[in-house]
Amino acid sequence: MGQKVNPIGLRIGITRNWDSVWFSKQDYIKNLHEDIKIRRFLQKKFKNASVVKIIIERFPEKINVNLHTSKPGMVIGQKGQNIEAVKQELKKFADKPIGMNIIEVKKPEIIAQAIAETVALQIEQRMPFRRVMKAELRRAMRGGVEGVKIQISGRLNGADMARTEKYMEGRVPLHTLRAKIDFGFKEALTTFGQIGVKVWTYTGDYFPTKEESDEDKYAVKRRTS
């Protein structure tokens, strides 16, 4: 099961929090579609800015968008011009004021989505895919991960038949739910068609603190009483 399912979705509530932080009964469908449109717009707008995560928080009077990127200068622009322009464009997706927070990713070499985007970009630039994959593996291991796996699929080097190749260093325990597994996916658009890039990184196991364990015990006791 761990080999097939998205490792982030499998660990929601265990090692990873939700990317959409809100709850609604009546407007669930409306809010969900707004979130999808906002994410697609920002990913397309800043496709070269290495955006690794977009977290959307909803409040009664406003919406907060937290954009995690390794290139904040490219997103913000000169004197914040890009942000103001984006805020104006985002107004058409929601009927509430939208605020944006730009959060810099300090170590993009260990973030799976950033690695996937780097590999896809170099494949589009016709770099040898094996050299690119091995270089990113070494960079991630030097960055401090305990394991990393990179897999690419498609017409590699323009071959007539599509195939899959993968390289791995360290260990990536996909079946261990407490393992902090990050996952990234990106498609490289080449003259021979699309090449899919998948990346898994493992940065150790998650063990809750005593305070978190006490909170869990209290929550279970409250549900059963």
Curated annotation (Swiss-Prot):
Any one Gene Ontology BP term: translation
GO cellular component terms listed in the entry, alphabetical order: cytosolic small ribosomal subunit
Domain KH type-2: residue ranges: 38-106
PROSITE patterns given in the database record: KH_TYPE_2 (PS50823), RIBOSOMAL_S3 (PS00548)
UniProt GO MF annotations: mRNA binding; rRNA binding; structural constituent of ribosome
Annotated SUPFAM superfamilies: Prokaryotic type KH domain (KH-domain type II), Ribosomal protein S3 C-terminal domain
Similarity comment text for this entry: Belongs to the universal ribosomal protein uS3 family.
HAMAP family with a match to the protein in the record: Ribosomal_uS3_B
Protein name: Small ribosomal subunit protein uS3
